[in-house]
Amino acid sequence: LQKQDERVVEIELERLRGFVNHPFKVLADSQMIELQESIKKYGILNPLIVRPRQDGTYEIISGHRRKFAAEKIGYRKVPVIIRVLKDDEAVVSMVDSNLQREMISPSEKAFAYKMKYEAIKRKAGRRKCGQVDHNLGKKSIELIGEECGDSPKQVQRYIKITELIPEMLEKVDDGSMGFTPAVQLSFLKKKEQKEMLDAMEFAQCTPSLSQALRIKKLSADGKVL
């Protein structure tokens, strides 16, 4: 389907599938309740964006929360726009549409940036000879920063924290550990991160930036934490 030929159609919920490795959480929170109430009152104003799969189902590019809300209030079908997208195009589109949300946790943004970064790199690697791309001189990180409103350095930091163990990431998301110290701790091996987590739980505190930098250096020097 070409973009100019797009139209809204209704698809059964049972034929919709979540995006593979979707980095954005769908939570049954107060915002979800508000969304459900809005759908009850006005219907789904913005159609979901989906792409066709070979088995006759559709993968959601944008609209995971709307699908969840529609299921909860008993909808059988939802309005969608069907787009034929290659895998990497779908990743970029999914990330871009979800980054527009007001409330995004650090871990959601981190994994979204990582997925987009890897997709852009793959697309660039497959570029055919003779094709003109005005962004060829820019790094993938810089492109993401320009499009998403973060500096290239900040994009790199977000991607780096995807190397944290889940329990560490939870502390970043809930605000109990600062983002910048977390970036430094992401350089630790997984075993060291678990030991660090145990120490944090025992002391009931999280490291400052200066402490995290010292811990990172100890790890790099091969010394026991």
Task: Please annotate each region the language model reported.
Residues 22, 44-46, 100, 131, ...:
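Glutamine-centric residue-chemistry signal
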Residues 1-83, 89-103:
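Short, charged/polar connector segments at secondary-structure boundaries
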Residues 61-62, 137, 174, 211:
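Residues at the start of alpha-helices and the adjacent loop-to-helix junctions
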Residues 41, 101, 119-123, 202, ...:
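A structural signal for alpha-helix termini and helix-coil/disorder junctions
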Residues 46-52, 83, 97, 114-121, ...:
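Low-complexity, flexible helical/coil segments
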Residues 24-25, 32-33, 67-163, 170-173, ...:
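Amphipathic, charge-rich alpha-helical segments that serve as recognition/docking helices
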Residues 1-3, 130, 153, 210:
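Intrinsically disordered, low-complexity regions enriched in polar/acidic and amide residues
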Residues 12, 150-225:
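Amphipathic alpha-helical extensions and coiled-coil-like segments
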